[in-house]
Amino acid sequence: MKTLLLTLVVVTIVCLDLGYTMTCCNQQSSQPKTTTNCAESSCYKKTWSDHRGTRIERGCGCPQVKHGIKLECCHTNECNN
């Protein structure tokens, strides 16, 4: 009986996806789109210019950035593309 109850709990957790994760884009600059699942509740896109031109970094969370770097944070799946 305990095994059946444990199985039902596990199936419920899997079906309800209680450990919801965000899907954020993580490709750099003009690379083809790639995504990753994140535990954070936000995605970011950092943009800056250097000797190679405009650079873009995407990922999970909402990091602090240095002066001169544009940061955009958002809260929906793949919102940082």
Swiss-Prot record:
Expressed by the venom gland. It comes from the Eukaryota. Residues 1-21 form the signal peptide. One of its GO terms (cellular component) is extracellular region. CDD domains: TFP_snake_toxin. The keyword S-adenosyl-L-methionine does not apply. GO terms for molecular function: acetylcholine receptor inhibitor activity; ion channel regulator activity; toxin activity. Keywords: Acetylcholine receptor inhibiting toxin, Disulfide bond, Ion channel impairing toxin, Neurotoxin, Postsynaptic neurotoxin, Secreted, Signal, Toxin. Disulfide bonds join C24-C43, C38-C60, C62-C73, C74-C79. Gene3D superfamilies: CD59. It is found in: Secreted. Belongs to the three-finger toxin family. Short-chain subfamily. Type I alpha-neurotoxin sub-subfamily. Binds to muscle nicotinic acetylcholine receptor (nAChR) and inhibit acetylcholine from binding to the receptor, thereby impairing neuromuscular transmission. This is Short neurotoxin 2.
